[in-house]
Every structure is written in structure tokens, then in C-alpha cells.
Design a protein with these regions (language model features):
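Conserved short histidine dyad/triad with adjacent acidic residue
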Residues: 31-33, 48-63
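A short hydrophobic beta-strand segment most commonly corresponding to one strand
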Residues: 49-50, 94, 109-126
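A short, N-terminal "cap"/entry segment at the start of jelly-roll beta-barrel domains
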Residues: 1-44, 126-144
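A generic "binding-loop/recognition-motif" signal
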Residues: 56, 64-65, 83, 99-100, ...
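Short acidic-glycine-tyrosine-enriched beta hairpin
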Residues: 82-97
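Short beta-strand His + acidic residue motifs that chelate non-heme Fe in jelly-roll/DSBH
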Residues: 59-60, 78-79, 95, 101-107
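Glycine- and acidic-residue-biased ligand/ion/polar-headgroup-sensing regions
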Residues: 66-76, 81
Length: 144
């Protein structure tokens, strides 16, 4: 179990070890590891790492909160409204709240993406304009 430390005002600040967080299959070819979420005690931000197989994609959807994607590895396409972009390692994409978007791995190898979402649960109020929602419940640290 990860250690925690008392912060100012007696708040507990968890230290989360990624090796203690299981990776879940969010949709075919897309796995997720929630690095920070409400399940970990985070209240204002969620962090998620996706590992994405070649050709795998998330369908058109929108969130009520802003999100940011950082491409760590690979090449992905991103659709924002009517525009389509190709982005690679170290590129950052800021997706405003309520903007329909989709994305997928367009490269020959695995892609790895880091996501940051504002709010307590970015998936709760998501609207899928195509396809179905992903599995999005982050497991608690130390649980399978």
C-alpha cells in the first residue's frame, strides 16, 4: 500500500505508486491506468494513462469539463469538432469542455497518452455522440 503524509490542516496526501494501480480494458485495444481520481482522494483533477493498440479509437463524444492530452509515445489522430489533426510524442492537445472530439492510434506501433481532466469525475457527464462509453471506473490502489 502506498504511504500517505499529513499535509497542512491535517489533510492526508496520498503517494500513489503506478505499479499498485491495475490497468483496465476501457474499450477494445485501449487500456487505462488511473493515476489520480476520486478513488485516490483527488477532488479537482483526474490523471489517466492510456495504452492504445494500432487502429484502436475512441468514438465521438464530449465532456462537461476541459481535458488535456499529452502524447507520450506513438502517433494519434485527434478530431476536434470538424478539424482533424495528427499529433506525435510531446504534443499537447487541449480540448475545451463541450467540444465533440474523437481520437485514435494512427501509427504502426503502440501509443501512450497522458490525460488530465478537471472536476471530480470527467466520465459522469460525458455524452457519446457515436459508439458507447468506455469502462471508466478506476479501481482503488491495491485492488485488482
Amino acid at each position: 500500500m502506498s504511504p500517505s503524509f499529513a499535509g497542512s490542516g491535517g489533510n492526508t496526501l496520498p503517494v500513489i505508486k503506478p505499479q499498485e494501480i491495475p490497468e483496465i480494458e476501457m474499450r477494445p485495444g485501449i487500456r487505462g491506468q488511473f493515476l489520480a481520481s476520486a478513488a485516490h482522494g483527488a477532488r479537482g483533477v483526474w490523471l489517466l494513462v492510456n495504452t492504445v493498440d494500432p487502429g484502436a479509437a475512441a468514438p465521438l463524444h464530449k465532456h462537461t469539463v476541459e481535458e488535456t492530452m499529452v502524447v507520450l509515445e506513438g502517433t494519434v489522430w485527434v478530431r476536434l469538432g470538424d478539424e482533424r489533426y495528427t499529433v506525435g510524442p510531446q504534443h499537447t492537445v487541449i480540448i475545451p469542455a463541450e467540444i465533440p472530439h474523437a481520437w485514435g492510434n494512427s501509427g504502426p506501433g503502440m501509443a501512450k497518452l497522458l490525460w488530465a481532466f478537471g472536476g471530480p469525475d470527467p466520465f459522469h457527464d460525458s455524452i457519446y455522440l457515436e459508439g458507447s462509453p468506455p469502462v471508466s471506473s478506476p479501481p482503488m490502489p491495491g485492488q485488482p
